[in-house]
């Protein structure tokens, strides 16, 4: 008889996999030697069967990139944990676009970068002041659920915060940084995540932050909700942005941007919310005055503002401001403009600022 040997096809248990390199950043205050560590950190959970501990199993593999200054005192050198928003965005935008020691040479409005694209030293990197740990939330970048786990468990508010909090705890413990000043930096939805993380870290994990940095803050999602017709806050809050955008594109000749913004902010703070709350109770004169004011500030026609019932939805604004020139305005950065595919589209059909990134 011939014996047969069965070979297990089960995948090996995941383990941390990181790569470390060393570099030097040239800043305004001199050269800064630093260490870069990137890769996946495995998050694990305890397993019990009928109350009996069975060990641990992997639940997620979280991707991070950490930059730490060499020869720094960890009790005084801060560390900042950084992520973008979405939800659903990796951290590469803040990493390679703003805070990291290297950044994409991206050009600017009217001067887009041409291929071949390049990375350059970022002399204004926050690494000159704090160590940086860039984190990709679940299903973004290279972060994935472990085999047999459901990524959806981490896509919600609570699961997202729990996973990132656990990653921060692990990194802090393994790098002996509990005594370091600690900060969280979030962008857009990441500001809401950051605020929730501060409570989560302080509560279950016993880690106290020294500060939060909120970029493009949106702690109250109703402040950007244009779809709820009973919510007028977004219309008032966006008015100064519309006014600044209109000024950028020549709709306020002879006026300074600060002057235009001051008027828009004053109107958005006081008269505009009152006007919107009055609805059909506005007199003809009050409505006409509001239409004229909004048209002047936003750069739109009085006819459009009146048809919009004094409420200017942001996607429509980007498509309407330069409609006569058959161009759209950027949403992420309203200095950018691009050709409109349609001259009759209800709202912008593409974001020229996003396309330029």
Language-model segments: which ranges?
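Active-site-proximal cap/loop segments of hydrolase catalytic domains
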Residues: 46-48, 105-177, 223-224, 232-236, ...
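N-terminal cap/lid subdomain of alpha/beta-hydrolase-fold enzymes
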Residues: 2-6, 48-153
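N-terminal cap/lid segment of alpha/beta-hydrolase-fold proteins
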Residues: 13-71
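Alpha/beta-hydrolase fold nucleophile elbow
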Residues: 176-189
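Catalytic nucleophile loop
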Residues: 190-195
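Alpha/beta-hydrolase-fold catalytic nucleophile elbow
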Residues: 84, 185, 213-216
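Alpha/beta-hydrolase fold catalytic core
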Residues: 279-357
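A catalytic-pocket lid/entrance helix-loop region that shapes and gates access to the active site
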Residues: 102-105, 198, 202-300
């Amino acid at each position: 008889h011939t014996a047969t040997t069965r070979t297990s096809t089960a995948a090996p248990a995941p383990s941390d996999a990181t790569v470390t390199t060393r570099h030097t950043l040239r800043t305004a205050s001199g050269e800064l030697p630093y260490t870069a560590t990137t890769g996946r950190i495995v998050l694990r959970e305890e397993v019990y069967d009928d109350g009996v501990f069975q060990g641990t199993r992997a639940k997620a593999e979280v991707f991070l990139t950490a930059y730490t200054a060499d020869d720094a005192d960890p009790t005084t050198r801060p560390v900042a944990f950084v992520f973008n928003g979405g939800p659903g965005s990796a951290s590469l935008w803040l990493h390679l676009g703003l805070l990291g020691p290297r950044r994409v040479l991206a050009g600017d409005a009217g001067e887009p970068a041409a291929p071949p694209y390049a990375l350059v030293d970022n002399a204004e990197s926050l690494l000159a002041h704090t160590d940086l740990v860039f984190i990709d939330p679940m299903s973004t970048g290279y972060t994935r659920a472990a085999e047999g786990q459901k990524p959806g468990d981490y896509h919600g508010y609570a699961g997202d915060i729990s996973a990132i909090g656990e990653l921060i705890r692990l990194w802090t413990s393994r790098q002996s940084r509990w005594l370091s000043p600690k900060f969280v930096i979030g962008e857009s939805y990441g500001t809401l995540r950051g605020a929730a993380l501060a409570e989560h870290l302080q509560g279950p994990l016993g880690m106290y932050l020294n500060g939060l940095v909120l970029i493009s803050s949106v702690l109250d999602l109703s402040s950007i909700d244009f779809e709820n017709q009973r919510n007028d806050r977004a219309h008032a809050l966006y008015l100064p942005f519309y006014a600044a955008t209109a000024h950028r594109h020549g709709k306020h000749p002879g006026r300074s941007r600060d002057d235009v913004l001051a008027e828009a902010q004053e109107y958005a703070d006081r008269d505009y919310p009152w006007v919107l709350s009055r609805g059909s109770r506005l007199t003809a004169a009050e409505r006409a005055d509001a239409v004229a004011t909004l048209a002047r500030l936003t750069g739109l026609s009085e006819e459009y503002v009146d048809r919009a019932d004094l409420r200017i939805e942001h996607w429509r604004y980007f498509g309407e401001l330069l409609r006569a020139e058959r161009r759209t305005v950027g949403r992420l950065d309203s200095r950018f403009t691009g050709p409109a595919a349609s001259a009759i589209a209800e709202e912008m059909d593409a974001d020229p600022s996003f396309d330029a990134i």
